[in-house]
A protein has these predicted regions:
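N-terminal Rossmann-like NAD(P)+-binding domain of SDR-like oxidoreductases, especially those catalyzing
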Residues: 1-123
Length: 123
């Protein structure tokens, strides 16, 4: 089984990736590294002893999402990509809406177009 983890380089995402890899699943990560670091990918691989495929891109990037689904046979998506700072969200509500709602809608559209019906959302 191949799982796409959005926001997979963040704290919750990276820990989830380790568990998925330990369960024998293949993991593809997309993360724009706004609130994380590519170093997390190295740690995921070191802890699990397995490699991951990483795309440094925004979940709103339709072309990259299309390429991921064309390249990998994605069975399930775990969607952790999202902006979450309450104070900043009040200062930048449109940016948060675009990222959190717009990104989720693009992701769901690409999933639908590729026959992927399994998604886990994290608020």
């Amino acid at each position: 089984m191949t799982v796409l983890v959005t926001g997979g380089m963040g704290y919750i995402g990276s820990h989830t990736c380790v568990e998925l890899l330990n369960q024998g699943m293949d993991v593809v990560i997309i993360d724009n590294l706004v609130n994380s670091s590519a170093e997390a990918g190295k740690r995921i691989e070191r802890i699990s002893g397995r490699s991951v495929t990483f795309y440094e891109a925004d979940v709103r990037d339709r072309k990259t999402l299309d390429r991921i689904f064309e390249t990998h046979d994605i069975d399930c998506v775990i969607h952790f990509a999202g902006l979450k700072a309450v104070g900043e969200s009040c200062q930048k509500p449109i940016e948060y809406y675009d990222n959190n709602i717009g990104g989720t809608l693009k992701l769901c559209d690409v999933m639908r177009n590729n026959g992927c019906k399994n998604i886990v959302l994290s608020p």
